Amino acid sequence: MILRRSLCLLALANAAVCAHAADWPNFRGPTRNGISVEKGWRTTWPGDMPVAWKAEVGLGFSSVVVSEGRAATAGYADGKDGVFCFDAASGAVLWTHRYPAELGDKFYEGGTTGTPTFEGSRLYWLSRWGNLMCLEAATGRVVWEKNIAQETGAPIPTWGYTGAPLVHGDLLVLNVGDAGTAVEKATGRLVWKSEAKDAGYSTPFPLGNLAMFGNAKSYVAVNMQTGAEAWRFRWLTEYGVNAADPVLAGGDVFISSGYGKGGARLKLQGTQPPEEVWKTKALRTQLNAAVFHEGYLYGVDGDTTQKSPLKCIDFATGEEKWSESGFGSGGLVIVDGNLVALSGMGEVMIAPASPSGFKTSARTQVFGPKSWTAPVFANGLLYCRNGRGELVVLNLK
Amino acid sequence: MKRRQFLQYAALSGTSTFLAPFVRSAEPRKLRTALIGSGWWGKNILKEALASGRCLPVALADVDANALEIAADQVQDLSGHKPKLYRDYRELLAKEKPDVVIIATPDHWHALNTIEALKAGAHVFVEKPTGHTVNESRAMLKAAVESGRVVQVGLHRRIGPHHVSGMKFLKSGAVGDVGMVRLFAHSPGDGPEKPAPNEKAPDGMDWDFWCGPAPLRPFSKKLHPGGWRNTLDFANGTLGDWGVHWLDQVLWWSGEQYPKRIFCAGGRPVLGGAVLNDKEQTSDAPDHQVATYEFEKFTCIWEHRRFAGNDTEKHKIGSYYYGTKGVLHIGWKDGWTFYPTTKGGKMEHEDSQLQEPDGHNIQILWADFLEAIDGRKKPVASIELAHRSSVLPLLGMISWRTGRSIQWDAAKEQIIGDPAANALLSRPYRGPWVYPSV
């Protein structure tokens, strides 16, 4: 174990050395943009889908995180939320941490919505209901836990807290309250909080010292150390659902919401409010944020209630380049220049990320609907989960 | 110049350049349309109004400034027209004098909104059930009759294609003699219900106004958005929300206008006792109910469960008509299906034809409303019919509240020999709002 850790440190200099160089330790991956640069995996396979392992994790739409040979996610069953940790290679259950929780089936099946965060020997988890905890990654032992909603008095938004904890130095930055909340990651001690108003559903995204995320009525940027608000960009969306993470591209950022709202490219200006470059109705990301690759955005346009298309839009203009109909409210990641997408109906599709069209090299029906969770790629394994809690891991090595 | 004179001159002149502007103005004037309650469902209806090409969205009213702003954006996207925005529906009606008003507020507001809109001279499309209590519904009917305006109620299952064909099949005698009808809506769910904290209402929302004539409850996400359906101050639970659609179908099929006797049992054994204190609250509608409606020629049972909804039974929502030749299920997304009981009987089925994503038929109901406004027909879900249908779940709720069976005198619209139950035909209003008079 010690040897492996030191190898990983060396890996900073040479990624190929470490077995876990291509970990996916937090929501949206190592660089928080849905991109993995991992090479040497296959974009096509003959015959049946190459299943590495399968598991049942309960109801919900939590994504998977992968670090140092472990894979974790969450789900709900029998009156309890569960945080599950698996051996990434074999799928053996390393530990499970369960606690009483509500189903929360408000206009959908219910279950967990957020995603845990690995950092070193710890796993951090914020539940829909405000249960915030630090678990030992190796054992699942509770290092500390609390209910952050109760402690701060922040209201729980309609579908609960969904943003994953962001580790920043000694702090965990959370999308809780009007403009975030931070606790000490070692102890859970509250460091700063914001007004007791509804949070949005996105994960705090670091921009230097600032974290940017959606609240009920805008995207806000706050200083991560102090909680001081730098700016807010008014972004009124139906039911306060600002869920998609900001997508950073150069010095600009793309924000987008569903319910017909649309997207906008904003020019970032440090601690000054950003300036709108363009707006579009061509890409309205209700749940999963788009992914940026070589001048283009790829993402799902529309709501869970529709058979939404997968689209490519030009980041320079906001214009649509192509639209693949019937994709549904799934998600995608980009791995070494390839779109690795999981449709709302549970079909994996792999295609080169290109503005000229969506030409798949592989398509496999992994499970049934609803799969609203973007797939995760780490160390040659593709992690897919659906709302019912089927977790299917494909081996693309 | 009077219009008729103008027409004569225009005809005489015979030049196309002179005629052109006149031809354009001869197109029917667009109906100045307003929406009261600009949430999810209100916007769905307004979208159909805009899609009809005959309605100009002049104004929106909502007690939530955020909901107004979002709706205004969508209306502008769809129509290119910027509606005027109002917090107070009374001000909207007084200033805009709309031709048509859509009412999609929670149930406890339907009566006051509708009556005021009719007084302002508008035709009204109001959501089901008509009233929150029986006498509100009666007052709405009275106001509609006095105004001479068209009132269409959002009972889109009166016109939905598979309901129309299912009814035709049923009335053809193909199901035989029907002696019993079972209506139901089941969903999966868990218990006990955990209270949600009371909160400050969101910025921009006038919560006192939202509660209006109903008791002023503390704001909670249990209530808004959508959850008010299961809080009895504002609605009547699943029986009021879903039951009215299916009970309406029973009146349509049978031609009977009312049941003689009603008994309803139910409770919250799964969700647990209702909570309302200064810190938190739960919903308070029953998690299940069984209501028996005794008609002249058949018995009708309503049944809902907000737990244990799975595939044990083939259908989860809709109606079973039990006849001597078989069982007809008329459902929602699953269309209608006939299951014969006779040897050699043929199973028959027709798919639903619904508008997605929300599975309704508002588009054709709106078209029917416009035809009625044009004077070509009576609206298919008229206030007269919808009043009788809406009374049924409301009487079911009164039986459930009093814990005894009630007998309905439809001519007098009174419960026979039960003053305590009759008292529940109305309810006290919170001032300054005044209960409408019948």
Segments and roles (model prediction):
Chain B
Residues V164-S165, D177, R182-F184, P188-E384, ...:
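Contiguous beta-strand/loop segments that form the cofactor/metal-binding neighborhood of enzyme cores
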Residues H123-F125, T130-F209:
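A contiguous active-site-proximal alpha/beta segment in oxidoreductase catalytic domains
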Residues D64-A67, Y86, P106-H110, T130-H132, ...:
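Short, solvent-exposed turn/loop segments enriched in Gly/Ser/Thr/Pro and often Arg
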Residues M1-V126, H132-V150:
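N-terminal glycine-/serine-/threonine-rich beta1-alpha1-beta2 phosphate-ribose binding loop
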